Amino acid sequence: MLVAATLGTSFSCVCPPCEAPGAQGAKPAAVVPVGSRLVVWDGEGGGIEGGKSWADCDKKGACKATLAPAPKLGKDSTNGLKFHAEGEGWQGAGWNWFGWWPETAGTDFRSYTHLTLWIKVTPKTPELAPEPGALGFLFGCSAGKKSSGSVVLGKYDKNLFDGQWHKVTVPLADFYVGKEGAEFDPGTAWEFRLNHWAGAPRNFDVILDDVAVEKQ
């Protein structure tokens, strides 16, 4: 199923991008990087406003995938962003911090070097935890609606699946490798995505908080 969640808006949207009803006038400018850290999600108004989410899975009728703001589930009992995955096969979701509008919106990542985020992975039971090598993270850009290369989050923290909060740091260069990474435009980044695949049924939540790009 494909579902969408919104934050601070009165209409819904699903992936692929759609135009806001009644949108008129000049398009807002892209977010210009300022300083050494740019937050795209913190759930408390410190990120980029107007974001929306999508979620989907490939075993229709036997899988679930959702991504939505989750009050009090963040790192400091603030608002987290919860990805729920259930069933076998592929589940994926994304948070577009522009809400897909305007279609040419984007944030310029080129002056930043690293992604940082806080993450907590909680399975329904231990045997239903995600595959350690199968929980991926990637970006999307508005230019050509391309995806970056995907990284395996477990590679950057060997204890990622212990049910506790972890700060994960990933060099942005890791997203720019391979064919997809070469086609991705870091000058128009506008979405981050999670994905997972397993051959056996899984049931788990991933909570994200304080998602940012930094100069390190």
Model regions and ranges:
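Short beta-strand-plus-loop segments that form exposed binding edges in beta-rich domains
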Residues: R193-P201
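Bacterial signal peptide processing site
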Residues: V14-P16
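Short carbohydrate-recognition loop motifs
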Residues: A68-N96
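Short, surface-exposed ligand- or partner-binding patches at beta-edge/loop junctions that are enriched
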Residues: G181-R193
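Extracellular carbohydrate-recognition regions
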Residues: C18-C63
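Extracellular ligand-binding interfaces
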Residues: E88-G181, A200-I207, A212-E214
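Bacterial N-terminal signal peptides
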Residues: M1-S10
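Short, surface-exposed loop/turn motifs at beta-strand boundaries within globular domains
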Residues: V34-S36, G74-D76, R110-Y112
